[in-house]
Curated annotation (Swiss-Prot):
Residues 61-74, 107-122 have a biased composition (Low complexity). This is WD repeat-containing protein 55 homolog. It comes from the Eukaryota. SUPFAM superfamilies: WD40 repeat-like (SSF50978). WD repeats lie at residues 154-193, 198-237, 241-279, 282-321, 324-363, 408-447. InterPro entries: WD40/YVTN_repeat-like_dom_sf (IPR015943), WD40_repeat_CS (IPR019775), WD40_repeat_dom_sf (IPR036322), WD40_rpt (IPR001680), WDR55_POC1 (IPR050505). Belongs to the WD repeat WDR55 family. Residues 12-23, 31-48, 76-87 have a biased composition (Acidic residues).
């Protein structure tokens, strides 16, 4: 189809020869019919995906109607709507193709985004060996990843204390309204076993007996209660055990336990008797924590007025009291084969005492410069501390090193405990939640030498495997590792090829 068969080339003055009007109209009609025939044949050849190329081809054909192969131009040619009709036909063909694909998907039963009609995601079509798709591998890894710690427990009431059962996978949660919730925990789910109503006021501390059959609780109502865990029946009630609100409990063995109140009074009790064995008041402020070693000869107590007080259990009298500190002594733990006592303070410091010499500390570590209110020994040389900043940090004892962040809360941490196997750490915060952290990886930590170089700034902010946060440096470390692998691979290939011929 060429227009130059009917038109003469223009002269230098761009004048067209006189042509019969009927001939021009006939030629234009033939051109329009040819274009329509071509568009109909192209509908079967092109799909919606090729619409762009098709329109471009048709536009070129339309331009041929006005411009001849030898460059001639007909200004008298009439405009037609053939182009519009072609576009409409192409769009209609594309819509029909899309409709057919939609009907086919419906017949296969596939939902949006790879889901079945019920809306449940189906990832069976993903190919884990498809190394070219990083997203596919990440999705499969997330699906197959198993939990290493139980899910979070959330309560409506403020959680004042938590305690693990000495033998079973049970954790007790004491609340501000005086109830104790018993949960059976597991990596997949946590199950509420029972709720025991024990006190009329806030239950400040909860402990299990050594055999795990009974719960001991103390409260702001000045009472101590011993409750059977299975039957929920009250076994023993120490009514008005103290003149002031009781703040802390500590179980020494199967027979003895100690209590401390807000006024600094410490009492020792025997489960077989009604009254306390003895009581001493050596400080004027709240007892924050109590503990003893395996020999149970000395009972140690820290207080909010900055004293570390030691009581001789056998002699039932004061053993020694430390020099006063200008900060609250809030927690403590025993390390290095029962040879070291470490106490945490409200200023974030850690004081170390040689066992038996509690008058003054032998070493001091500045710590994290944030109030430390809780401490739990993880191993003989590693402690976990927590406080008002909402972070649980691990530190190495003697020499002191910040190992990193074990876990995080959005609000200050209220209580901290570790289970009987030493693999699971639990913490509660002011947000009424309990979170679990798997700390089994600490078994592989080696001893730290005194002269070993370290970066204190990075260690304080480093996230350990149990943390829900990742380190920014890990992303670049992976990139560096991949680059090193590529470099090593290239070096091996060069080595195998023999010496270079370049001189």
């Amino acid at each position: 189809m060429h227009t130059h068969e009917h038109f003469k080339s223009p002269t230098n003055e761009d004048e067209l020869d006189d042509t019969d009007d009927d001939m021009v109209a006939g030629v234009i009609a033939e051109i329009e019919q040819d274009v329509l025939n071509e568009s109909e044949s192209d509908d079967d050849e092109y799909d919606l995906a090729d619409m762009g190329a098709l329109v471009q081809h048709q536009a070129a054909s339309s331009s041929d109607d006005s411009i001849s192969s030898d460059g001639s131009f007909d200004p008298n040619a009439e405009d037609t709507d053939s182009d519009d009709s072609m576009i409409d036909e192409v769009a209609s063909a594309g819509a029909s193709s899309a409709k057919r694909r939609k009907e086919q998907s419906a017949d296969d039963g596939a939902g949006p985004s790879g889901s079945d009609p019920s809306g449940v995601s189906d990832y069976s079509h993903l190919d884990e060996d498809d190394e070219t798709d990083e997203t596919v591998r990440a999705m499969i890894a997330a699906i197959k990843k198993t939990r290493s710690a139980p899910p979070e427990i959330k309560l409506e009431d403020f959680i004042t204390d938590i305690c693990f059962h000495p033998e079973r996978d049970i954790i007790a949660l004491a609340t501000i309204i005086g109830d104790v919730h018993l949960y059976e925990y597991g990596n997949e789910e946590n199950k509420l076993l029972r709720t025991i109503e024990v006190h009329a006021k806030a239950c400040r501390d909860v402990e299990f007996t050594e055999d795990g059959r009974s719960l001991i609780t103390c409260s702001k109502d000045k009472c101590v209660m011993v409750t059977d865990m299975e039957t929920e029946k009250l076994k023993k009630l120490y009514e008005t055990a103290h003149d002031d609100a009781i703040n802390k409990l500590f179980v020494l063995d199967e027979r003895l336990f100690a209590t401390g109140d807000d006024a600094g009074t410490v009492k020792l009790w025997d489960f077989r008797t009604k009254d306390a064995i003895f009581e001493l008041k050596e400080v004027e402020d709240q007892i924050t924590q109590m503990l003893t070693n395996e020999q149970n000869k000395l009972l140690l107590a820290t207080s909010a007025d900055g004293y570390l007080t030691t009581y001789n259990i056998g002699a039932r009298k004061l053993y020694v009291q430390s020099e006063p500190y200008e900060e609250e002594l809030s927690c403590m733990g025993i390390y290095r084969g029962n040879s070291k006592l470490v106490a945490g303070t409200s200023k974030g410091r850690l004081y170390t005492y040689n066992w038996g010499y509690f008058g003054y500390h032998c070493d001091m570590y500045p710590g994290i410069k944030s109030p430390i209110s809780l401490m739990v020994p993880i191993t003989d040389r590693i402690a976990c501390v927590a406080g008002e900043d909402g972070n649980i940090r691990a530190c190495h004892i003697a020499p002191y090193r910040n190992l990193g962040v074990v876990g995080q809360h959005n609000m200050p941490i209220e209580s901290l405990d570790i289970n009987c196997s030493g693999e699971l750490l639990a913490s509660s915060s002011h947000n009424n939640d309990v979170r679990f952290w798997n700390v089994k990886y600490f078994e592989d930590f080696g001893d730290i030498k005194y002269n070993e170089k370290h970066n204190a700034y990075k260690e304080k902010r480093h996230n350990l495997p149990s943390s829900k946060c990742t380190n920014a440096s890990d992303f670049f470390a992976d990139m560096t590792k991949e680059q090193d692998d590529d470099d090593n691979g290239g070096q091996d290939n060069n080595t195998g090829a023999g010496p270079s011929n370049i001189t």
